């Protein structure tokens, strides 16, 4: 599960300030040992991470993953193992996600853009079902189409002027 899916896979969702709902506490699916508490502050940030060894993603251990977080709330992890080691230059070491032998949850949107992660997950799922895996499973899903589109948009826009209008330079990621 990613983001809200991660939260729902946990034991419980708590919303004492009624940020997301009028219900203060709701049972989760109980598939991951986490409890989510919603908060008024929203986390929005770009993330660079590495896949941690073990579990269903073990074949991708050490692979680089990039994506973003956008969520209200924090997961209190009560067991399992983390999925990703977050790379925070100059920051304290941190982890994201929770995994058990069969279930993985994370706040990291975009993690499936990593070919090694995608290949590891699909190969593991195939093995569990007795299906032969395909080495192309980790290939670029879009054949660079998004990169070509981004290049065309950048060529057609005055990014400096757009940056002045938004009061920050474009191309710079802020956490």
Would you name each region that the model predicts?
Residues 25-29, 54-57, 92-96, 129-133:
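Glycine-rich loops and low-complexity Gly/Arg-rich segments
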Residues 93-175:
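Acyltransferase
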């Amino acid at each position: 599960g990613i983001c809200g899916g991660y939260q729902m896979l946990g034991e419980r969702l708590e919303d004492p300030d009624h940020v997301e709902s009028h219900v203060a506490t709701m049972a989760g699916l109980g598939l991951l040992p986490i409890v989510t508490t919603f908060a008024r502050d929203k986390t929005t940030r770009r993330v660079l991470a590495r896949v941690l060894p073990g579990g269903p993603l073990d074949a991708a251990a050490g692979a680089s993953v990039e994506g973003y977080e956008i969520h209200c709330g924090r997961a209190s992890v009560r067991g399992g193992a983390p999925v990703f080691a977050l790379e925070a230059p100059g920051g304290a070491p941190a982890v994201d996600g929770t995994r058990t032998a069969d279930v993985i949850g994370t706040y990291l949107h975009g993690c499936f853009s990593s070919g090694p992660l995608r290949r590891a997950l699909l190969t593991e799922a195939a093995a569990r079902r007795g299906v032969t895996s395909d080495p192309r499973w980790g290939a670029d899903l879009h054949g660079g189409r998004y990169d070509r589109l981004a290049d065309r948009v950048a060529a057609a826009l005055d990014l400096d002027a757009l940056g002045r209008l938004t009061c920050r330079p474009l191309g710079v990621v802020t956490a």
